[in-house]
């Protein structure tokens, strides 16, 4: 079975999971953290080398202040409680997103996680925090424009590859598979550049219910697809009339 090296997940449905059980939204987010732990443990066993998770979008700041505060607290708790285990398990942590507007203590924790695990190789866990695909593209364009204005690069020499090299995901391969839970059918501003040719799998379960079997199910779905990258599939090639 063909296994994608890089799987990205939109972890959606924490609030609805909690509401369906008559629980506060925070309970859903806490259950979501536990689902993340299980997924991180399962990923290397299933042959995944890179796992990117949409933890907090740049649009999430518009949520009620109490919920934002709860989410920040859960991030701090996750890193403080789980970082040692991640490191011992050989997991490398990478953070993508705009760190400029984050509190100093959160920035420090994110940097600590990256620094401590920088040499690990069993799995790269990419946490998208204060991340938005459009924002990432705009920030990259600004960096390149500034470099061109300083004469450091020739604007005419910018290519898709050189632009990608300026993204937050520099050095990380594009995801072959993007999974979204909760039944919603959209990308929600997630990895807009990187997911250009990704296979998309939408699962009806809410994120707190996501399990190893759900991940394996998505991998089986991926293995059954033919990736064309804008070209012809094998059946299309086989059905073309022979030249003569």
Curated annotation (Swiss-Prot):
Tell me yes or no: is rRNA-binding among this UniProt entry's keywords: no
| Entry binding sites for Mg(2+) | 12, 199
Active site positions: 12, 60 (proton acceptor)
Q: How does it assemble?
A: Homodimer.
Q: Which family does it belong to?
A: Belongs to the UPP synthase family.
Report the PANTHER family cross-referenced here: DEHYDRODOLICHYL DIPHOSPHATE SYNTHASE 2, DEHYDRODOLICHYL DIPHOSPHATE SYNTHASE FAMILY MEMBER
This chain belongs to which protein, by name? Isoprenyl transferase
The scientific name of the source species is Mesorhizobium japonicum (strain LMG 29417 / CECT 9101 / MAFF 303099)
Name of the encoding gene: uppS
């Amino acid at each position: 079975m063909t296994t994608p090296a890089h799987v990205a997940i939109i972890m959606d449905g924490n609030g609805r999971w909690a509401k369906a059980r008559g629980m506060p939204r925070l309970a859903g987010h806490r259950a979501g953290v536990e689902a993340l732990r299980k997924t991180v443990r399962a990923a290397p066993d299933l042959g995944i080398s890179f796992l990117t998770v949409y933890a907090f979008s740049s649009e999430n700041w518009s949520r009620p202040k109490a919920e934002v505060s709860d989410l920040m607290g859960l991030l701090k708790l996750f890193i403080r409680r789980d970082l040692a285990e991640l490191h011992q398990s050989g997991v490398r942590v990478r953070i993508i997103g705009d760190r400029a507007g984050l509190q100093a203590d959160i920035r420090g924790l994110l940097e600590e996680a990256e620094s401590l695990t920088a040499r690990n190789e069993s799995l790269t866990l990419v946490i998208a925090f204060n991340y938005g695909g459009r924002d990432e593209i705009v920030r990259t364009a600004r960096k390149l424009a500034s470099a061109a204005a300083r004469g450091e690069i020739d604007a005419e020499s910018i290519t898709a590859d050189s632009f990608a090299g300026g993204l937050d995901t520099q050095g990380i391969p594009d995801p072959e598979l993007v999974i979204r839970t909760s039944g919603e059918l959209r990308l929600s501003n997630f990895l807009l550049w990187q997911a250009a040719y990704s296979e998309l799998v939408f699962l009806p379960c809410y994120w707190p219910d996501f399990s190893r079997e759900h991940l394996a199910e998505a991998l089986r779905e991926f293995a059954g697809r033919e990736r064309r990258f804008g070209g012809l599939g094998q059946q299309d090639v086989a059905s073309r009339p022979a030249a003569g």
